From Swiss-Prot:
Function (record text): Ion channel inhibitor.
GO molecular function: ion channel inhibitor activity; toxin activity
Domain notes: The presence of a 'disulfide through disulfide knot' structurally defines this protein as a knottin.
Subcellular locations according to the entry: Secreted
Family: Belongs to the neurotoxin 10 (Hwtx-1) family. 17 (Hntx-9) subfamily.
GO CC annotation terms, alphabetical: extracellular region
Protein name per UniProt: Omega-theraphotoxin-Hhn1f 2
Tissues of expression: Expressed by the venom gland.
Keywords carried by this UniProt record: Disulfide bond, Ion channel impairing toxin, Knottin, Secreted, Signal, Toxin
Protein's organism: Cyriopagopus hainanus (Chinese bird spider)
Amino acid sequence: MKSIVFVALFGLALLAVVCSASEDAHKELLKEVVRAVVVDKTDAVQAEERECRWYLGGCSQDGDCCKHLQCHSNYEWCIWDGTFSK
């Protein structure tokens, strides 16, 4: 009887240690994912600030849009300006 209780308590202690280690690994993985998402968003914002806006991209003035596009005054997105050239 004593040995069964001892084995059960030992099993519970071992399970607690394994779960704790698993939870720590899960937290570290979650931190890495959040860091990756934040870095990707930061890089995307910087890229948008450096580059022109493509067709239907948000804008506030014509200079925000790429070549042959203009900023639509009502909807504030880049639309084709009607010109053709190379």
